[in-house]
Amino acid sequence: MTLLALVWLLLDATFLITLLWHLLQGCKSGHSLLCSVFQDLIRYGKTKTGLQRPAWLQWFDIPKRCFWHFYCVSLIWNGCLLWILLRLLLQSVPVPEWLQLVLHFLHAGSEPQILDRELSVILALALLWLHSLRRLLECLFVSVFSNGVIHLVQYCFGLGYYFLIGITVLTYCPLDRRTVSTDNLLTQCHWYHILGLALYIWASLHQYRCHCILAGLRKSASGNVINLNHSVPCGDWFERVSCPHYFAELLIYVSIAVVFGLLNTIWWLVVLYVLLNQALAALLCHEFYHEKFDTYPIHRKAFIPFIF
């Protein structure tokens, strides 16, 4: 097993244990220092509302509006990786030595990569880059952030996450192949590339709509911000789940798994991480809505329609 796969497995295990611990009411009502730190680390934004926190924990608070930093870093980093890959494949420009060292360190001991995966890797990196661009623009020009906060650990983790994602994609094809022609890339095109792109577009469209609905709760008809309160969102996938934008995020990562032809094992570990991470965040939001609004629709699930 490579170090990269081990990292994703550890992240999966950590969030699975955290989710199960929360579902079993662990530390939910406890007032010990350990419970306070646990709750502070798993919550952010509105789900921290009403949380009894020691004053010193507030030293680690960072405004939630800094979410745009994650997408800015991802845009630059994954854009650079895509540029390096395209120059290698189309112009025979070698991969920088520092990147080769990073890839070797994280992916040493893996099975030899199979040729003719270049198109899948190019598409995956391009989709990640486009996703980061859209989310950055949404954070800057659509979303209306309250005074909610995130923990410094969550902030640092988020920055590292997008670094790791791009590296994970690159490990799927050999980077010692000097050139690949446009005709060769076209011959690599399969049905799963088209299906993955369709799912990506569909999920991205719904995520954008959901973010617009959330922003609209704090804006007037003319688009001016009129409040920073929390309200019950309605419309689109909100009719089925409390956090459809999290569900759409999961579908976006599944769509990239489809682009890989469902064969990239490490990427499925990434998908599992997104599933567990977003499920925990959705569950906390779902509980917040039910505690704050007595008339909150009881038929809505937290994360996945009809299931969870």
From Swiss-Prot:
Any one GO BP annotation for this protein: dolichol metabolic process
EC number, as in UniProt: 1.3.1.94, 1.3.1.22
Annotated pathway: Protein modification; protein glycosylation
Residues passing through the membrane, by range: 3-23, 66-86, 121-141, 149-169, 185-205, 256-276
Lumenal side: 24-65, 142-148, 206-255
Entry membrane topology: Multi-pass membrane protein
Protein name as annotated: Polyprenal reductase
Organism of provenance: Xenopus tropicalis
Gene symbol of the encoding locus: srd5a3
